[in-house]
C-alpha cells in the first residue's frame, strides 16, 4: 500500500533534482559565454583609443610596443641575450590583456543581466483611450507620456505609468524576480506600474509616465550595460593619485640612464621598461574599473537599481540612516487589538463609531477595526457610512473618517490631532483620554481616538510588532559608527517604546513629511552623509535631499525619480544591506590599492640588485631573496606583476570579506591583511617563479 506513495515522492524529488541540474547547467553555460566574450574583448580593448582611458595600463602597453620593436633590432649589450626583449614584451602584453580581461569580465556580467531584461521588452500593443472615449490599439513603441491606456487581465502593461482607475493584481516577476503578484490601485502610494509586467486579474486604467527609450526597463538596461556608468569622485581621485605616481616613476626611469652613464655603465632599454612597469601600481590600475563595475553589479544582484556608482559609494560613507517605523522597523500590520471607552461611554458606542469611521477605509488598520467589531458582535449602520463622504487619512491632518449625510462628522486618528479637532468643534476632552492613550503607548501600541463632532467616545488600541533581529542589525550599524533615526507619526510615548525595543539611537515622533527633510538637513549640517527610504509622493523631497535615497519599486513615480536607488523588492530594511555593499566596495578598492603599492617593496629587492650588481657589486647585499641571476630576477618580478592580476580578479569581483566594525578596527585589519600581505606574498611569489625560471635560463 505504501509503495506507490514512495515512488511518487521519488519522482517528485527526481524532477526537482533535474530542474536544479538544468539551472546549474544553464548558469555554467552563461558563465562560459561571459568568459569567452571577455577574452575577445580583452584583445579588442588593446586599441590605444580605449587604453588611454586607463593611463597606467596605457604606459604598460607602450612598454610592450617598445620592447617588441627592440626584439627585432640588434642588441648593443653583451649581457642581454636576444630572447630577453621578446620575453619581456610578451609578459607586458599579457599584463595588459589580464587587466582588460578583468574589466571585460565585469562588464560581461552586466551585459548578461541586460540581455535578460531585454527579453522582457516584448512587442506588445496597447489599448489607448482617446479624448472622445474611443479605444484605439497602437504599438507600445508609439505610446507617449500622458497617454491613457486600459490594461485587462492577461495583458502586458505596455509602458511605465500610474493607475488612475481600478484595482488589479500585477505579476512583476520579470522585473523583481518575485513570483507573488502585487496589488496596484488608483490613488495612494501603490499606483505605480512598470512596463513589461503583466496584469493577472481584473482591469486597470493607467496614464503613461515615460516616452519611448526612457522607461524604467530602458534605464535598467542602460545602467547594467554600463552605458550610463561614469567614474565616481573617489574613483577619479584615486585614478589621479595613481597616474601621478606613474608619472613620477616615469620621470625617474627616463632620467636614470643619465646617472648610470656618469657611473660608467649602461642599462638596457628593456630592463628600464621592466623597472618602470614593476614600479607603477599596475595591480590596482588593472583592477580599478572592474572593482567599480562589480560593485554596481553586486547591488543589482541584490535587486537594487543604483542610478550611479556615486550612489553606491555614498552608501559606503553613510553616517546616519533615517528609517520609517511602519514596514521598516515593524511589520506595519497594525491591527485593532481592543477598544477603550472614555468617560461614561460604553464599548458598544466606541465600536459603533469606530466601525462607521472605517467602513470606507481600505487601509489594513481600517479593515482590522471592522473585523474586530464584527468579531465582538457590535452592531453598526454600514449603509449610513457608505452613503457619507469618506475623508482619507493625510500626513498633515493625521486622521480619517466620514462626513454623514445628516451633517455628523466621524473621525478617528492620532490623539493630538483628534483632540485639537474636537476642541475646534467646541467640545470638551474627557480626563482619561490622555491617561488611556499613555497606557497604550507604553505597551508599544498605537492609540487612535474616535470622535463624533465635539464628543470623544474612546480609543482604538492598534498593535504592531518589531521585526525579529532588528536590534542586532542596529547594533551592527552602531559598531560601524552609523546612527539610526526612526521617524514615525506615532505619539512620543509609542515612539519611545518602539525605539527602545528596536534599539534605534534616536526617534522623531509625530513626524510629518517636512520634518524628515529637517532631520536630514540637520544631520548634513553636521557634515554627515544621510540615507533614507521612502515610497510615497510626500517622501520625494526628503529622498532628493538625502545623500542616498532608496525608493520602493511599489511606490509612486515621483518617489522613484527623486531617489538615486530603487529597491525592486520594495523592502525598506534593505537600506542596511545597501550600506554594507557600499562599504564593501570602498574597502575592496582601498585594500587592493594597499596591496598593490605594498607589492613594490619586494619588486625593488628583485630588480634594483639585478640592474646594478654588475657595476656595483655591493648591491648584491640587497638580493635578500637570493634570486638565481639578474635576468631571472627581472623576469620573475615581471611575471609576478602580470600573474597577480588574474589571481585577484575573483576578489575584485566578489569584494573583500566585510564584517561590521568601527573604522579604526577595519583600517587596522586591512593594513594587517593587505598591507603586510602585500609585502610578504610577492617575496614568496617572486622566489617561486625565480626557481622555475632558473630551470630554463
Swiss-Prot record:
Subcellular location field: Cell membrane
Keyword Mitochondrion listed: no
Record-annotated membrane-spanning stretches: 55-75, 79-99, 245-265, 271-291, 605-625, 633-653, 677-697
Primary location: membrane
InterPro entries: ATPase_P-typ_cyto_dom_N, ATPase_P-typ_P_site, ATPase_P-typ_TM_dom_sf, ATPase_P-typ_transduc_dom_A_sf, HAD-like_sf, HAD_sf, P-type_ATPase_bsu_IA, P_typ_ATPase
GO CC terms of this entry: plasma membrane
Family per similarity comment: Belongs to the cation transport ATPase (P-type) (TC 3.A.3) family. Type IA subfamily.
Protein name (Swiss-Prot/TrEMBL): Potassium-transporting ATPase ATP-binding subunit
Lineage, uppermost ranks: Bacteria, Bacillati, Bacillota, Bacilli, Bacillales
Gene: kdpB
